[in-house]
Amino acid sequence: MTNMIELRQVSKSYGQGDAEVHALHKASLAAIEGEMVAVMGPSGSGKSTLLTIAGTLEEPTTGEVLIAGQSVKDMSKAKKAQLRRRTIGYVFQDFNLLPGLTAAENVSLPLELDGTSARRARVVALKALDGLGLGNRAGHYPDQLSGGERQRVAIARAMVGERKIVLADEPSGALDSVNSEAIMRLLHSACKDTGMTAMVVTHDAQLASWADRVIFIRDGRITDQTTPLAGPESLLVKAASTNPELDR
């Protein structure tokens, strides 16, 4: 199986001298094709930094990032931008929906930018929204949607097309427990059915139990990893010393 995301001894520091902060320290991981990986850890542990570096949105101070086996270390900014647009979908806590576009237009825009016809892009967007229970909200603008609905639009946008990787930072943060489970189920199914690779940051052990593998991070260091075969309770025990903020 192909390593779709690979970090090799990645470190990230901010500032200099006494003010230097080490957000990541020699983090190494790999996520293979079709795998769903959850990342858990306390606030400020480096989870979001790990995700943005894995998605080539941020440069590591040292170390190397590979996407689908290809190092991005010496790529030009233009080539990285092209890689992101064609290969990686992002879902962050701030939804970044364009206020002047409808839900369907927000979802179809990345496809159109990549050369898909407007008509075909709309068909794909409507199908994606319908799959997330938003078929009747496709013509609504972001300010006409609830926070949970906007989050689902962002998830649909990240997954449309032939994206091989989806990176999600607390993708269910604005959703209730039922819709949160539905989102994780959808991501898990997409990984198994299409070979997509997903990396999801979450504080919720119940949601992390949908992943094939869970990585624990603390103080910028990957401290452990496990398969959640025994369910969320085993993750809570595993993470007790790593993340006191886990839902109990």
What are these regions (language model features)?
Residues 2-217, 222:
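ABC family nucleotide-binding domain
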Residues 221-248:
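Conserved beta-strand-loop-alpha-helix hinge in the C-terminal portion
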